[in-house]
Amino acid sequence: MAECRLIRGGEGFRGKQGLDYFAGISAESTGSKAICMHLLEMPPGASAKPHYHESHETAIFVLEGVAEMRHGSNLEHVMVTGAGDFVYIPAGVPHQPYNPSDGIVRAVIARTDPNEQESVVLLDMQDTPRPS
């Protein structure tokens, strides 16, 4: 019979994207079959590597701070998010979150991929200007 699981905060890992995540719900931590959820903390000036999640959707809830996210096939769009905002990223959409502010950004991230990093595909976009 399946059992409920408790994952205590505090342990973390560095994702392929170049950001630090606090371990949460995943196939690795709980045996989940269809969901992954983590806490992300982005220090001032932090930026993820451009990437997308193959075949998996992402939902984000911003707890604290102001972040920006470039998105689109050439990262041509910019979305500004703040505390209390929800963000939806469809599967396969390139994106790059970054923190242009002088404060920390905290967000809860959930994906329909139960694995922590399996569906992360890094993009080679070195010629694309990085956020300042």
What do these predicted regions represent?
Residues 1-34, 49, 122-132:
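A short, N-terminal "cap"/entry segment at the start of jelly-roll beta-barrel domains
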Residues 47, 56-83:
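A short beta-strand-loop-beta hairpin characteristic of the jelly-roll/cupin
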Residues 49-50, 69-70, 78, 89, ...:
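Short beta-strand His + acidic residue motifs that chelate non-heme Fe in jelly-roll/DSBH
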Residues 38-54:
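Conserved short histidine dyad/triad with adjacent acidic residue
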Residues 82-83, 91-117:
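Ligand-binding loop in jelly-roll beta-barrel domains
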Residues 21, 37-41, 59, 78, ...:
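Conserved hydrophobic/aromatic beta-strand scaffold that supports enzyme active sites
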Residues 30-33, 42-46, 64-68, 115-116:
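Short, charged/polar surface micro-motifs in flexible loops or helix N-caps
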Residues 39, 52, 71-73, 99, ...:
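Residue-level recognition of conserved beta-strand positions in structured domain cores
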